[in-house]
């Protein structure tokens, strides 16, 4: 009877099932460059992806906004975006509310908007609230806009670009970079944040790769995991549906163990947009997905 029930159960299992493949190996982060030799095609595809451009050092090749002495008024403050040789400079209200010049250190995202990170004392990277709409001009893009257009956010507000809620170390780093160590010093309120990959590299989804590299040298058949710390086979057969009660997306079936579906999208990071979207941050008409 047990054998019959087991056979019936197996026949009902989905085509892509979850199979136990052994214990999770202990591994260290090695950086995406270590993957290129064996995975050249995947690297080329990744270089064209938004993952590769989730965060980049500011340069003429990465900055999409027009830093041509463009001016943007908001809440009584006139901000100016300009170029000084290879530097991208924003003149805007600082932590004390006074106008000052700030160098853009990094770009943040590429579509449908690009934000810019400025470094403040104490190792803090802050995301400017004035961003560049990267959509085509015909779609209403190629312009500067404020993330809170209907408010009057000044330096005393927690949502001001110099505040905690716009702090990269605290709010953004874990998803936009790999192997982030925030290293916050509570005594003096400073950061000494480090990472192994600035953008979302291979190990951002696959986990630390040292054990996989060790496996690749000999490829022992006994290691069905191939030295990988994260399995990505649960993307097969999975569906995301909106819970009417919470408004959040729910995965069906739920994830099991250490396996991971592909990184899900959310409203601010490439979510599917309806034709009614009139702004790159129009939450009302963007299908949302949870973080992975």
Locations of regions flagged by a protein language model:
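Post-cleavage N-terminal segment of exported redox proteins
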Residues: 1-21
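Primarily the internal scaffold of c-type cytochrome electron-transfer domains
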Residues: 16, 33, 41-109, 113-120, ...
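Extracellular/periplasmic ectodomains of large secreted or surface enzymes and adhesion receptors
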Residues: 22-23, 291
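Residue-level marker of regulatory loop/turn positions in helix-turn-helix DNA-binding domains and
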Residues: 23, 27, 164, 194, ...
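Local sequence-structure signature of Cys/Sec-based thiol-disulfide redox active-site neighborhoods
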Residues: 25-40
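Disulfide-stabilized extracellular ectodomain repeats and their linkers
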Residues: 32-35, 169-172, 202
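Extended acidic/polar, glycine-enriched regions
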Residues: 120-129, 134-170, 174, 178-182
């Amino acid at each position: 009877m047990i054998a019959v029930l087991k056979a019936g159960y197996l026949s009902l299992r989905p085509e892509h099932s979850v199979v136990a493949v052994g214990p999770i190996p202990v591994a260290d982060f090695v950086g995406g460059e270590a993957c290129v030799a064996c995975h050249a095609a995947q690297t080329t595809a990744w270089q064209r992806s938004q993952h590769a451009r989730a965060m980049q050092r500011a340069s003429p090749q990465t900055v999409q906004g027009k830093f041509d002495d463009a001016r943007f008024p908001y809440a009584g403050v006139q901000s100016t975006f300009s170029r000084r040789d290879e530097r991208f400079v924003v003149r805007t209200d600082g932590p004390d509310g006074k106008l000052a010049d700030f160098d853009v250190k990094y770009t943040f995202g590429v579509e449908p908007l690009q934000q810019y990170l400025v470094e403040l004392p104490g190792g803090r990277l802050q995301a400017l609230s004035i961003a560049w709409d990267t959509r085509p001009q015909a779609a209403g893009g190629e312009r500067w806009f404020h993330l809170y257009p209907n408010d009057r956010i000044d330096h005393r507000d927690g949502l001001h670009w110099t505040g905690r809620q716009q702090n990269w170390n605290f709010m953004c780093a874990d998803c936009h970079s790999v192997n982030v160590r925030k290293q916050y010093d509570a005594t003096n309120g400073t950061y000494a944040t480090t990472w192994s990959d600035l953008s979302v590299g291979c190990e951002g989804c696959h986990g630390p790769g040292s054990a996989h590299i060790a496996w690749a040298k000999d490829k022992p058949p006994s290691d069905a995991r191939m030295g990988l710390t994260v399995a990505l086979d649960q993307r097969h057969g999975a569906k995301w549906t909106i819970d009417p009660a919470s408004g959040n997306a729910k995965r069906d079936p739920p994830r099991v163990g250490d396996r991971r579906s592909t990184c899900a999208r959310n409203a601010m990071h490439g979510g599917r947009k309806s034709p009614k979207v009139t702004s790159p941050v129009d939450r009302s008409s963007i299908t949302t997905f949870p973080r992975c």
